[in-house]
Amino acid sequence: MTTTDIRKAIEEIGYTITSSWRKDYGDGRVLSEYKLLKSEKSRKPLAFIQAGYYTAGKKIIGLSVTLASNMSNCIDCNTIQDFETCLKAI
């Protein structure tokens, strides 16, 4: 699973994301957090997605989705199928 897979899954479901922040640890690891919106006109976030990955190949090493409504963790995703299931449940 890569960052491209994440963006593609979100777009297919019809949500919009904006990159909130990105931290590069300098050793090849990066942590990104995305704010998930229902549409481009929406200002209220549905969820926050944290993805940890290596810059080479952007292979995901950790992925979690936190619901904005109550800040509970939706799922720690190990596969793109887990991630898509979580997004559809929002």
Task: Give the location of each predicted region.
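Long, highly charged amphipathic alpha-helices
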Residues: 5, 82-89
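Short, flexible helical or helix-coil boundary motifs
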Residues: 13, 17, 56, 87-90
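Intrinsically disordered, low-complexity regulatory segments enriched in Ser/Thr/Pro
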Residues: 43-85
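Negatively charged, low-complexity tracts enriched in Asp/Glu with abundant Ser/Thr
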Residues: 1-40, 74, 80
